[in-house]
From Swiss-Prot:
This is Motilin receptor. It comes from Homo sapiens (Human). Expressed only in thyroid, stomach, and bone marrow. PROSITE patterns: G_PROTEIN_RECEP_F1_1, G_PROTEIN_RECEP_F1_2. One of its GO terms (molecular function) is G protein-coupled peptide receptor activity. One of its GO terms (cellular component) is plasma membrane. Belongs to the G-protein coupled receptor 1 family. Receptor for motilin. Residues 57-74, 135-157, 271-298, 359-412 are cytoplasmic. InterPro entries: GHS-R/MTLR, GPCR_Rhodpsn, GPCR_Rhodpsn_7TM.
Length: 412
């Protein structure tokens, strides 16, 4: 297979690429990674896709179907499950790019949407976690204020605002990427109405962070020059938008680290409040409320820690990716990012597993939903206060619920 890196039809002749030669593209594969890396990564990602989609669908169905589960905290978690589902929908496109960075066959719209939806849902998840942590802080450290501020209607409105802010913040990504033809391949009109492939000298020195895939090889066989040029089309940032893309990637990084700082402060204050309140409580209602608070914080802390562990490498990899020009660091960045990609999709798949492991109420509701039992699982009784809210969950203590030690139940 020919390659613009070693072609001799350019006006300046062939020049060596700025990093070691990569295997050429063919009809089956166009990737800088060997099969020994692609196969296990693909297997892991497909497992995450199946587990994540099924788990998040169950979470959304539980919160939508059972009124006991429709609480302020669980409304956030249900919205986060929708965000995770949308993130997981981008996994097949990332797998396609791992195996075949070019040609991109899904059109410019899906090229733009695959990045935009992933970024927008990432922002939405971060904003949801921050808002949920603020609610928990108010419920535990400022309970009187929480009784006034936190209601289901306001939480639903806030969730809509969070989604709007997230999607608007990610809006520039719609214009920063597109289906680009490799600069090293162009169709040049020839004599007698013929056409030929021309190799541009610009192909020898593209920005290293723009495209890590191997140089394209035109399809073998009697394809035309136009078909060979089409083979080089790739979903990637536009060269004219590289500066703006760098800015947006730093915005994305700030979107991660600023909420992380906020979460650290909030959970530090919550932990101090819960620790200082570890004293004998009067009556079963106070004892049940305290256990509900602790269970809620325990679940949310596990979710937040899993989120940080899974997403931190992703953002560190991006920082390395957009700042390195050294070929050895480039190879390190490639393999670091392929691991970070798996952790990124793990974060979108793991929350339902955590809910199932930690929350008895979630397990009971999921068991009832999946087996379609007619009888209500144990503990699924309701009590209402004057506002008509359902008591007994992680969010119930924020709106003036009447709780007892028997009906304090948590989902997460």
């Amino acid at each position: 297979m020919g390659s613009p890196w070693n072609g001799s039809d350019g006006p300046e002749g062939a020049r060596e690429p700025p990093w070691p030669a990569l295997p050429p593209c063919d009809e089956r594969r166009c990737s800088p990674f060997p099969l020994g890396a692609l196969v296990p990564v693909t297997a892991v990602c497909l497992c995450l896709f199946v587990v994540g989609v099924s788990g998040n669908v169950v979470t959304v169905m539980l919160i939508g179907r059972y009124r006991d589960m429709r609480t302020t905290t669980n409304l956030y978690l249900g919205s986060m499950a929708v965000s995770d589902l949308l993130i997981l929908l981008g996994l097949p496109f990332d797998l396609y790019r791992l195996w075949r960075s070019r040609p991109w066959v899904f059109g410019p719209l899906l090229c733009r949407l695959s990045l935009y939806v992933g970024e927008g849902c990432t922002y939405a998840t971060l904003l949801h976690m921050t808002a949920l942590s603020v609610e928990r802080y108010l419920a535990i450290c400022r309970p009187l204020r929480a009784r006034v501020l936190v209601t289901r209607r306001r939480v639903r409105a806030l969730i809509a605002v969070l989604w709007a802010v997230a999607l608007l913040s990610a809006g520039p990504f719609l214009f920063l990427v597109g289906v680009e033809q490799d600069p090293g391949i162009s169709v040049v009109p020839g004599l007698n109405g013929t056409a030929r492939i021309a190799s541009s000298p610009l192909a020898s020195s593209p920005p290293l962070w723009l495209s890590r895939a191997p140089p394209p090889s035109p399809p073998s066989g009697p394809e035309t020059a136009e078909a060979a040029a089409l083979f080089s089309r790739e979903c990637r940032p536009s060269p004219a938008q590289l500066g703006a893309l760098r800015v947006m990637l730093w915005v994305t990084t700030a979107y991660f680290f600023l909420p992380f700082l906020c979460l650290s402060i909030l959970y530090g204050l919550i932990g101090r409040e819960l620790w200082s309140s570890r004293r004998p409580l009067r009556g079963p209602a106070a004892s049940g409320r305290e256990r509900g608070h602790r269970q809620t914080v325990r679940v949310l802390l596990v979710v937040v820690l899993a989120f940080i562990i899974c997403w931190l490498p992703f953002h560190v990899g991006r920082i390395i990716y957009i700042n390195t020009e050294d070929s050895r660091m480039m190879y390190f960045s490639q393999y670091f990012n392929i691991v970070a990609l798996q952790l990124f999709y793990l974060s979108a798949s793991i929350n339902p597993i955590l809910y199932n492991l930690i929350s008895k109420k979630y397990r009971a509701a999921a068991f009832k939903l999946l087996l379609a039992r007619k009888s209500r699982p144990r503990g699924f009784h309701r009590s209402r206060d004057t506002a008509g809210e359902v008591a007994g969950d992680t969010g119930g203590d924020t709106v003036g619920y009447t709780e007892t030690s028997a009906n304090v139940k948590t989902m997460g």
